[in-house]
Swiss-Prot record:
<keyword id="KW-0961">Cell wall biogenesis/degradation</keyword>
<protein>
    <recommendedName>
        <fullName>Membrane-bound lytic murein transglycosylase A homolog</fullName>
        <ecNumber>4.2.2.n1</ecNumber>
    </recommendedName>
</protein>
<dbReference type="InterPro" id="IPR026044">
    <property type="entry name" value="MltA"/>
</dbReference>
<dbReference type="GO" id="GO:0071555">
    <property type="term" value="P:cell wall organization"/>
</dbReference>
<dbReference type="Pfam" id="PF06725">
    <property type="entry name" value="3D"/>
</dbReference>
<dbReference type="GO" id="GO:0009253">
    <property type="term" value="P:peptidoglycan catabolic process"/>
</dbReference>
<comment type="function">
    <text>Murein-degrading enzyme. May play a role in recycling of muropeptides during cell elongation and/or cell division.</text>
</comment>
<dbReference type="InterPro" id="IPR005300">
    <property type="entry name" value="MltA_B"/>
</dbReference>
<keyword id="KW-0456">Lyase</keyword>
<dbReference type="GO" id="GO:0019867">
    <property type="term" value="C:outer membrane"/>
</dbReference>
<dbReference type="GO" id="GO:0008933">
    <property type="term" value="F:peptidoglycan lytic transglycosylase activity"/>
</dbReference>
<dbReference type="GO" id="GO:0009254">
    <property type="term" value="P:peptidoglycan turnover"/>
</dbReference>
<dbReference type="Pfam" id="PF03562">
    <property type="entry name" value="MltA"/>
</dbReference>
<dbReference type="InterPro" id="IPR036908">
    <property type="entry name" value="RlpA-like_sf"/>
</dbReference>
<dbReference type="GO" id="GO:0004553">
    <property type="term" value="F:hydrolase activity, hydrolyzing O-glycosyl compounds"/>
</dbReference>
<dbReference type="InterPro" id="IPR010611">
    <property type="entry name" value="3D_dom"/>
</dbReference>
Length: 359
């Protein structure tokens, strides 16, 4: 949410409104903390919650990934990781965390009453071909480095109009929308339709022009009501408009993202560690250090994205960053493909967060 590394994903993980600045957020999608919190992190003695952690196994796997792929990050947090794993193995009663010598820090949230923003991002799978043919006519570009040194890179509209040399084309997809979403997410797996392994395209750079949220544009134009804005609402708008109208909308966002083919087969965050779905997050590293363990109280949604007035407790690790992930905001990595895209599109809610570390 440095992101040159595979999920730069979030220099541009601006997905929900195609920007994580979200035009509309209802504070009632979270809950109110009774006592006002002043500091970013307030040390507390105990978390009075009896629910169990639902992702203990995934948390263990994520810690092992850190140990293997970033030994230095693991060493910085080794005591915390080992203590939390010991706690999970014994009983994982949240109200007993302090008995294991773990410091507990309540985050003040965006409103000073504990409400932190919860959103999601994912890795898309894009159908593409090496050669332009039939519906596969939308170029995915590599970074034109020679232009970057000598002159400003073209705006999105100019790139759509073919101003870049064809030698920079990595592949052709069959959907301009998929290309745009790929840019927003910062990376994607490419399916060439040959029954071979998917190829990972990671973030290579951008053209340097300012990003503009298409969700906000649609709200400003009155195409979608502010209260109804969601990824699903944007998709519905797409189905009712022509390719030309969709392209015109995209062109209002002059920012453009370039990619590079990589040999890596896992999705990495800014910490150079493979991300485990629903156990890794992008966070603001001016508040949350990379490798930090966060206990999240997350809203539970139904299959239509409706908040059920229930919460689940999940342990996550801050392994990613994002240009739009600022302050008391966590962007949860949801995984790869369609199911992950739906879930990440629904999350625009509030929860609670506690930072855990060994005393």
């Amino acid at each position: 949410m440095q992101k040159k590394i595979i999920k730069t994903i979030i220099f541009f993980s601006l997905f929900f409104l195609f920007e994580k600045s979200y035009a509309y957020i209802n504070i009632n999608q979270g809950q109110q903390y009774e006592k006002k919190l002043i500091q970013n992190l307030t040390k507390i003695k105990q978390i009075n919650i009896k629910k169990k952690i639902i992702n203990a196994e995934s948390f263990y796997i994520q810690v092992e990934k850190i140990k293997k792929f970033s030994p230095s990050l693991y060493l910085k947090n080794e005591s915390t990781y080992k203590t939390i794993l010991k706690w999970l193995k014994k009983n994982s009663n949240i109200n007993e965390l302090n008995e294991f010598g773990i410091n507990l820090f309540q985050m003040k949230g965006i409103d000073n009453y504990g409400n932190v923003k919860i959103t999601g991002y994912y890795t898309p799978i894009v159908q593409a071909r090496k050669i332009k043919k039939n519906n596969f006519k939308y170029p995915i570009y590599s970074m034109p480095y020679h232009l970057k040194k000598n002159e400003p890179l073209p705006k999105r509209k100019d790139i759509y109009n073919g101003v870049l040399d064809k030698k920079y084309i990595l592949a052709y997809s069959n959907s301009l929308i998929d290309n745009f979403i790929m840019e927003i997410q910062g990376s994607a797996f490419i399916d060439y339709g040959n029954k071979k392994k998917l190829i990972f395209f990671s973030y290579a750079g951008k053209n340097g022009w300012p990003y503009k949220s298409i969700g906000q544009i649609l709200i400003n134009r009155g195409d979608i009501e502010k209260k109804n804005m969601s990824m699903q609402a944007i998709n519905k708008w797409f189905t009712k408009h022509t390719n030309k109208e969709i392209q015109d909308l995209f062109e209002k966002n002059e920012s453009f993202v370039f990619f590079k083919e990589t040999k890596k087969k896992q999705v990495y965050g800014a910490s150079a560690v493979p991300l485990i779905a629903q156990t890794s997050v992008a966070a603001d590293n001016s508040i949350i250090k990379k490798g930090s363990v966060i206990l999240l109280k997350i809203p539970i949604l139904d299959q239509n994205g409706v908040f059920l007035n229930k919460y689940e407790m999940r342990l996550v690790i801050a392994l990613d960053v994002g240009g739009a992930i600022k302050g008391h905001h966590f962007d949860i990595y949801e995984g790869i493909g369609t199911k992950a895209s739906i879930l990440s599109g629904y999350y625009n809610h509030y929860g609670y967060a506690w930072i855990l570390n060994k005393k």
